[in-house]
Amino acid sequence: MVRWAVARIAASLIVATMASGLAPAPPGSDATVRFARISNDPVAHGARLSRVLGCSGCHGALLTGQDWSEPGFARIWTSNLTRAVPSYSDPQLAAAIRGGVRRDGSPLWDMPSHLFMQIANSDMTAVIAYLRSRPPAGPARPLPVFEAGARKEIADGRYRSSPANVARVDTALPADLGAEFALGRHIVRATCAECHGPDLRGGVPYPGAIARPDLRIAAGYDTEQFERLLTNGIAIGDRDVGLMSQVARGRYKYLTEDERAAVLAYLHRLAQPTS
């Protein structure tokens, strides 16, 4: 199933690019880098961030959960957030989003918490406010059932739980290029790294998958071209670039123009040779 393959890209690229034993930054720190606040309403701010961060991409447009099962690998649903969220306290929700753990301490799987560890408290509060505003709908979703394929990859260390991925994050990736590029790095870490890996080098996430490009390719884009890519999904040469085009239209068009410019500036600087 295509959706399941997309989810596995992030987990596989983490395994391929991260060194083990690296301690993550403490979740919940009051980061100084934040997404733009274009509304004083926390629910509206959280709604925008939920789109940028991809909540509906995995949990569905109504956040009622989706079936990501793959025969022979796993039977797995994303949670129906409209049913799950009311039973969590705010700290428990933050721990689920940033740390990949349920309220009972058990691990989530394929929740990309490693992307969200650095999200500022004010932004996290807004996301939680938005999630709490959603009316209950649909049934609760079942816990995952791992079949032979998943069990083998778990045993081999190729498929990891969300908290295991959090524990392996190297906080220097994507590269820290200084305060001037901090916003771009912050956004890239929470979004682009999901498919292109924490070092943004791309690659083939698992056998048979389409290779993800090294994001230093963005050095070939000017501001107008990059705006078109991230808002309309049209790459240089009037091309539709598959998953990237879908993600741009579904997520990155909700970034502000200044946020998209910050991403481009960061990627341009990243592509420059180091002395």
Where are each of the predicted segments found?
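Periplasmic/extracellular electron-transfer cofactor-ligation site
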Residues: A47-A74, G99-P107, R134-P139, R185, ...
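Electrostatic cytochrome c docking/interface patches
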Residues: P27-R51, E153-V188, S275
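C-terminal capping alpha-helices of c-type cytochrome domains
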Residues: P91-R98, R102, L115-R141, E224-L229, ...
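Extended surface/linker regions that mediate inter-domain or inter-protein docking
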Residues: D123-L183, A262, Y266
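A short alpha-helix capping/helix-coil boundary motif
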Residues: A25-P26, T32-R34, F73, P107, ...
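Gly/Gly-Pro-rich "capping" loops immediately C-terminal to redox-active cysteine motifs
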Residues: A36-R37, V43, G60-A95, P107-A120, ...
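N-terminal export/targeting leaders of redox proteins
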Residues: M1-A44, S133, G138, Q272-S275
